[in-house]
Amino acid sequence: AIAEALGLPFALPRDASRDADIVIHASGNPMGLQSALTLAAYEGTILEMSWYGSTLVPLPLGEEFHSKRLILKSSQVGGVSPARRARRSYADRMALALSLLADDRLDALITGESPFEELPELMVTLSTTPSGTPIGTLCHRIRY
């Protein structure tokens, strides 16, 4: 439903095409990154957007990684590479980001809203269900 609201095609990994020139992985799950290696085409690029912190991520770098000559590239949202920094000023990048956020389709990503004062109690609710399993919250907006 979210992909449709954003105007994007969606497929489960088992149903996805196995010849993508670019695979963007952002699940934060090592198994998802492993799946990304199988979805990329020959000489394809896997753009890893997940943050694992100090978690060790096992990744099969034999098999398809070498035979398909894949490129694994990381993304860091906290900084702009020196090679690209001169293209746009900080103000230009901020203006672009804010204009992109004005797209009403992004409202599909908001799965709830709460006041800031409720945040301490809300964090437990947002991170787990009563059974202790992760909850399906994508982006919970906090009102300040």
Annotate each PLM feature.
Residues 17-20, 41-47, 104-106:
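Short, surface-exposed connector motifs at secondary-structure boundaries
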Residues 88-144:
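C-terminal hydrophobic helical "lid"/dimerization subdomain
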Residues 34-99, 144:
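Glycine-rich phosphate-binding loop and adjacent beta-alpha segment
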Residues 21-24, 37, 62, 98, ...:
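Generic hydrophobic alpha-helical scaffold/packing signal
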Residues 11-15, 75, 112, 143:
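Conserved beta-strand termini and adjacent loop/short-helix elements that scaffold enzyme active sites
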Residues 21-25, 49-51, 86, 111-112:
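Glycine- and other small-residue-rich loops at beta-strand/loop junctions that grip anionic moieties
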Residues 1-35:
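Adenosine-nucleotide cofactor-binding segment
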